[in-house]
Amino acid sequence: MSTDTILSFEEAMEKYDPVLGFEVHVELNTKTKMFSSAPNVFGDEPNTNVNEVDLGMPGVLPVVNKTAIESSIKIGLALNCKIAETCRFARKQYFYPDTPKNFQTSQYDEPIAYDGYLDIELEDGTVFRVEIERAHMEEDAGKLTHMGGATGRIQGADFSLVDYNRAGVPLVEIVTKPIEGAGSRAPELAKAYVAAVREIVKNLGVSDARMERGNVRCDANVSLRPHGRERFGIRSETKNVNSLRAVEHAVRYEIQRHAAVLDAGEPVIQETRHWHEDTRTTTSGRAKSDADDYRYFPEPDLVPMVASREWVEELRATLPEPPAERRKRLKADWGYSDLEFRDVVNAGVLDEIEETISAGASASVARKWWMGEIVGRAKAADVDPGHLGVQPATIVELAKMVEDGKINNKMASQVLDGVLAGEGTPEEIVEKRGLAVVSDDGPLLEAIDAALAAQPDVADKIRGGKVQAIGAIVGGVMKATRGQADAGRVRELILEKLGVTA
């Protein structure tokens, strides 16, 4: 594992300016692969969704997937790119076991989309423009699984297994121009940019956009230069970072590592790096290749593709509401304040709250549950809130039980814990745990008498008009009933008992 010396982030920022660059690979959710009729299905038995084209058998010819081209154009349009009138595929030559043809069919100097931009909103509302160099089509490689090692990497593994189901799956690679001027907000910008790309492709419906499945993967490039210098430093590329937090942490770590190398008077090596989530460090991969090393040349088996302006405009007309406009609409519909809505977006639960409202919850109740209960649990479990396993219908059911007086908020929180533990539905958990609210006034009056007897001075204050002191008595009753009393009803009974009008 990594033994790199690193500088503190603050010290690195005092001395250097970071320059970032991202290559985000988006798997398209087409029914078949990019150049073959083999199914594009995640999770099937290894090496079952493969045919002779994917394996590069002699004499086979590729056929371009039209839906993949349409999806690529839609992505380009959503990224404010220009769509090339003519583009072509190229062969990217390299040998690796997950590439059965010994080349990848990609695009080189004639991509389908180019010269775009994305305006990225940071957590405090600051907008940072990221310029897009290009978005090009290519096919994915197979998947290698390294067995016997401690880290899951090839280093130290006893052997490797290869699954070609992913070989030939259509990809769009989105490449940014160098990103300058982010300063100490570079890690935050990295996370926000990848989140924005993921949101766009999910909104377009062209990708499942599940990072944990590899539908969206990010290669993060980092270099540093001393303050005031224009020339870029040597960059490293951290490959296949597959979560938003990992992107943020990887960029932060690489900034600290580069700063330590430069401070020691040593050269930064242009290389790929591997990210390790458990230690939140990177380790060296291989020397970074330049384009010349891949010996690109035009794909001889595919003719250049012409995207007529009429076709492009037809596709533009099918684009859904852009995410930024959707957020503006939802904020107005839900009546959230600027701060409330920004917190929802930053927590990554916008879709979940929308689904919960669609399932029947009010906007305030949906926000209360996701922000007040679920986000905290997700942080404790170190997962994204949407991956915690809570369904919108569950939130609606819990909220209805509270509204109907069957359980109180404290009990509802316990029921949620039971749902996450797999104990059953909310109704089943309430019954199993005996969590129903005490609705009979008899037991409540007994608990109230005991609480008043234990705190006669508080009872006198309430009789004397200091009604706010009632909280101590209510607390005693709630403790005696193990939180199963209706606090509102308890308060009413206490005031009646003491002959006080609220």
UniProtKB/Swiss-Prot annotation:
Which keywords annotate this record?
Answer: ATP-binding, Ligase, Nucleotide-binding, Protein biosynthesis
A single GO BP: glutaminyl-tRNAGln biosynthesis via transamidation
Q: Which InterPro entries match?
A: Asn/Gln-tRNA_amidoTrfase_suB/E, Asn/Gln-tRNA_Trfase_suB/E_cat, Asn/Gln_amidotransferase, Asn/Gln_tRNA_amidoTrase-B-like, GatB, GatB_Yqey_C_2, Gln-tRNA_amidoTrfase_suB_CS, Gln_synth/guanido_kin_cat_dom
Name one molecular function that GO assigns to this entry: asparaginyl-tRNA synthase (glutamine-hydrolyzing) activity
The domain of life for this entry's organism is: Bacteria
EC number of the protein: 6.3.5.-
- Name the SUPFAM superfamilies on file: GatB/YqeY motif (SSF89095), Glutamine synthetase/guanido kinase (SSF55931)
Please tell me which top-level EC class this enzyme sits in. ligase
Q: Which reaction does it catalyse?
A: L-glutamyl-tRNA(Gln) + L-glutamine + ATP + H2O = L-glutaminyl-tRNA(Gln) + L-glutamate + ADP + phosphate + H(+); L-aspartyl-tRNA(Asn) + L-glutamine + ATP + H2O = L-asparaginyl-tRNA(Asn) + L-glutamate + ADP + phosphate + 2 H(+)
Tell me the NCBIfam families matching this sequence.
gatB, PRK05477.1-2, PRK05477.1-3, PRK05477.1-4
What the record says about family reads: Belongs to the GatB/GatE family. GatB subfamily.
Q: What does this protein do?
A: Allows the formation of correctly charged Asn-tRNA(Asn) or Gln-tRNA(Gln) through the transamidation of misacylated Asp-tRNA(Asn) or Glu-tRNA(Gln) in organisms which lack either or both of asparaginyl-tRNA or glutaminyl-tRNA synthetases. The reaction takes place in the presence of glutamine and ATP through an activated phospho-Asp-tRNA(Asn) or phospho-Glu-tRNA(Gln).
Subunit comment for this entry?
Answer: Heterotrimer of A, B and C subunits.
Q: Which protein, by its recorded name, is this?
A: Aspartyl/glutamyl-tRNA(Asn/Gln) amidotransferase subunit B
Q: Which organism is it from?
A: Pseudarthrobacter chlorophenolicus (strain ATCC 700700 / DSM 12829 / CIP 107037 / JCM 12360 / KCTC 9906 / NCIMB 13794 / A6)
Give me the gene this protein comes from.
gatB
